[in-house]
Amino acid sequence: MPSLAELTKSLSIAFENGDYAACEKLLPPIKIELIKNNLLIPDLSIQNDIYLNDVMITKRILEVGALASIQTFNFDSFENYFNQLKPYYFSNNHKLSESDKKSKLISLYLLNLLSQNNTTKFHSELQYLDKHIKNLEDDSLLSYPIKLDRWLMEGSYQKAWDLLQSGSQNISEFDSFTDILKSAIRDEIAKNTELSYDFLPLSNIKALL
């Protein structure tokens, strides 16, 4: 059985090479080793520098797991990884809470909720985030799902569509939800069109959809 260090190195190489299927195979044995070493769920009462360094590595492993799950469209797995990252991201320990992937993964989590049409949980999570992250909408990544939700709620489907078209702001993972959300917009337009018009020419329907 390879050591935790060897498995982690293999995971890093697979992720950098875009081999997300290999990542998914490596992650279960890595998580077993993390559990054995009391690292999967951080004990924030331990202030030992060596332990804190180890849990920082654990955080990066979980982030790789979350991003690999998005790339393989395994959204249930993504949600599990994100929930495991929450104790890190919302820790009072600055070192644990900060990450260059934090905004991206929170945004992906919100997009995942929107794609499930789980607006109740979306707004509940948004309230929580608003208490823990200052000026949410000033963050270009976090503002993406927030604007999308607002425009869908307002019925500003063209704005929402244009945002999805412009898409990803160079964040390829956002595109994992684009088709699902575009389909939701089409369904809403079709439903509203059916309610609004007794008769509508085919050419007009094509323009709306």
Q: How should these model regions be labeled?
A:
Residues M1-Y88, L148, Q158-K159, L163-G167, ...:
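N-terminal alpha-helical interaction modules that lie
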Residues F82-L209:
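Alpha-helical scaffold segments of alpha-solenoid architecture
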